[in-house]
Amino acid sequence: MPIKVPNDLPAATVLEEENLFVMRQDRADTQDIRPLEIIVLNLMPTKVETEIQIMRLLSNTPLQINVTLLQMSTHVSKNISQEYLDKFYATFDEVKDRKWDGLIITGAPVENIDFSEVDYWDELCEIMDWSVKNVFSTMHICWGAQAGLYHHYGVDKYPLEEKMSGVFPHRALVGDDPLLRGCDDVFWFPHSRHTEVRARDILKNPHLHIIAVSDEAGVGIVISEKANQVFITGHMEYDAKTLSYEYYRDLGRGMNPHVPYHYFPDDDPSRDPLMTWRSTANLIFGNWLNYYIYQNTPFDLNDVGKE
């Protein structure tokens, strides 16, 4: 089944060229079906690339999904025009009076500064508070996961001596969580971050459960007690060459980055990387949509947040 997007969203054309089922707004309006209503709060500077990456994963399920892109009103983007954002993105004021099945909060390249110094931090906190009663399940990605764990549970982030960049093996700590259903005993996905959350801090909170870890990358996936919040510390949504782009970008900035771990064949940046996490990403996003949302969300969205 498709995701529904605005008629002229550029990401839709890219996804259609990949033979993914994208339903334009005008066709979707004729469907008599209860689709899932998902918000994507896109905090990444690479807006269009992130749209494509997230929507590619959302579209690969049997469920029909309406996607609403959300921008921060208190932040001025340096990498895309406000005209584009106004055309394709909603503001919080435009979505806050509705209930939603799911919310995805992406990462952002701001982990080296304190949360309170992020210019849109207050607005993000308002959105995260609102999500507790108005969204059935929220997925937080990378810095979004760190922000959510800090805001909701007081879990701090810590600076790393070296950027955590690469594709790392993870293992499940639980055998029966639906989010990991179908995953291999060892499953890989990328990390790209300068800070980390630590297991010892998370384990102090009885309302949080670590369900996947990596010996190299640390905490991988955390869920809340009721599984209405998911925190993924890496970037499953990344394309095959995203880490390569970031590596060469940092080289160009004179930052002397380490070659991403377990990524380029023979650690040779001149060779094209293999994408070893595609199935993991599709499984976990699909499981989140199916088991965490579709199987449990109320048919009447107005009932979201009611005990």
Curated annotation (Swiss-Prot):
Disulfide bonds: none annotated. Keywords: Acyltransferase, Amino-acid biosynthesis, Cytoplasm, Methionine biosynthesis, Transferase. The record marks E111 as: Important for acyl-CoA specificity. CDD domains: GATase1_HTS. It comes from the Archaea. InterPro entries: Class_I_gatase-like, HST_MetA, MetA_family. The keyword Lyase does not apply. It is found in: Cytoplasm. Substrate binds at K163, S192, R249. Its EC number is 2.3.1.31. The active site is at C142, H235, E237. Pathway: Amino-acid biosynthesis; L-methionine biosynthesis via de novo pathway; O-acetyl-L-homoserine from L-homoserine: step 1/1. It holds the Pfam family HTS. GO terms for biological process: methionine biosynthetic process. It catalyses: L-homoserine + acetyl-CoA = O-acetyl-L-homoserine + CoA. PANTHER family: HOMOSERINE O-SUCCINYLTRANSFERASE. Transfers an acetyl group from acetyl-CoA to L-homoserine, forming acetyl-L-homoserine. This is Homoserine O-acetyltransferase. It comes from Thermoplasmatales archaeon (strain BRNA1).
